[in-house]
């Protein structure tokens, strides 16, 4: 299995393309100059395209991924109704979802042969919209509205329109600020990192009709932490055994173990990392975690070790200015 790591650095308007080997070493393959401040990125389900959001001219760009080394070639672009904060796709590669924090909306762009061709829907009044997350069954889009302390639930129609479910939303505790999410591989639980109080909520998907319930909330900060809380990103290993979330003020990654059924998280430790970690990701083998330091202008590679999933640093690498996003592609 070959793996490629992509890092987005908006201040220098660059994407760095790296080859990741089995020992956790990165080798630079390409530096792409992007026409705009590049932030969120996602790989298409068929692994042929990288979709990225740019500003100040709000667009989604599509790059073809070379099958031999992961290098990028520009392919297409499509306008967006707001500054892109988060980007994702449905599991069939038919639609791109973009959340915009500043515009307070989520948009749906139709894909044709892997390329973005037209905007098909926009939902407004989602204050602080920070991500758009499709459920494993490809039926429901979960959209955290950070400033409203709620996660909005939409059914994805066949033509890409978003229809509010019943109930149309679930609420976090006041002042939590729900931000990014991941789903457990067993499809029965979701995990949301809350930016403003640096906690993680565990949501149980109780039935196929969208009924969900918060079954656990866990503080992700050390007991002696007293500074401003500012959580950012969250990811889970492919086997569902380990979960990680980062806080930018503390510049740390919190390590969680996950119960076998996915319902319970336990804090296992805290890993100091690059300054102001805005984004990170986990490779497809579940062996390595790559974190980006927005203020250090470096990325660090960690090996995930032992039954607790603790992190051991393998190396760090200079990237562009202000790196914010990391994605990994396996082929």
Swiss-Prot record:
Xref: SUPFAM superfamilies: Nitrous oxide reductase, N-terminal domain
Pfam families according to UniProt: Lactonase (PF10282)
Keywords annotated in UniProt: Carbohydrate metabolism, Glucose metabolism, Hydrolase
The enzyme's E.C. designation: 3.1.1.31
Lyase as UniProt keyword: no
Listed GO MF terms: 6-phosphogluconolactonase activity
The reaction(s) this protein catalyses: 6-phospho-D-glucono-1,5-lactone + H2O = 6-phospho-D-gluconate + H(+)
Cellular component GO terms held in the UniProt record: cytosol
Signal peptide, first to last residue: none
Top-level taxon: Bacteria
Name recorded for this polypeptide: 6-phosphogluconolactonase
The gene coding this protein: pgl
């Amino acid at each position: 299995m070959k793996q490629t790591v992509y890092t987005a650095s908006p201040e220098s308007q660059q994407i760095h393309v790296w080859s990741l080997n089995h020992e956790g070493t990165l080798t630079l393959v390409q530096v792409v100059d992007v026409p705009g401040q590049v932030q969120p990125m996602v790989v298409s389900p068929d692994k042929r395209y990288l979709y990225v959001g740019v500003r100040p001219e709000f667009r989604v760009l599509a790059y073809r991924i070379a099958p031999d080394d992961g290098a990028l070639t520009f392919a297409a672009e499509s306008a967006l109704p707001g500054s892109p904060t988060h980007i994702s796709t449905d599991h069939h590669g038919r639609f791109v979802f973009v959340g915009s924090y500043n515009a307070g909306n989520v948009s749906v762009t139709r894909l044709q042969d892997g390329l973005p061709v037209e905007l098909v829907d926009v939902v407004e009044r989602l204050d602080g919209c920070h991500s758009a997350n499709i459920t494993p069954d490809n039926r429901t889009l979960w959209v955290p509205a950070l400033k409203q302390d709620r996660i909005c639930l939409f059914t994805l129609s066949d033509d890409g329109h978003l229809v509010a479910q019943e109930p149309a939303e679930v609420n976090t505790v006041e002042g939590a600020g729900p931000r990014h999410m991941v789903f457990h591989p067993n499809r029965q639980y979701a995990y949301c990192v809350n930016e403003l109080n640096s906690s993680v909520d565990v949501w149980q998907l109780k039935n196929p009709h969208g009924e969900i319930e918060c079954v656990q909330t866990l503080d992700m900060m050390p007991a002696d932490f007293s500074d401003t809380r500012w959580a950012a990103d969250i990811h889970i290993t492919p086997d569902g055994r380990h979960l990680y979330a980062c806080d930018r003020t503390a510049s740390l990654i919190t390590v969680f173990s996950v119960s076998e059924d996915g319902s319970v998280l336990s804090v296992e430790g805290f890993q100091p990392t690059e300054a102001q970690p805005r984004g990170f990701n986990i490779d497809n083998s579940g062996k390595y975690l790559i974190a980006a330091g927005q203020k250090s202008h470096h990325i660090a590679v960690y090996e995930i070790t032992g039954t607790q999933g603790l992190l051991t640093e393998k190396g760090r690498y200079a990237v562009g200015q202000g790196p914010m996003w990391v994605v990994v592609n396996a082929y």
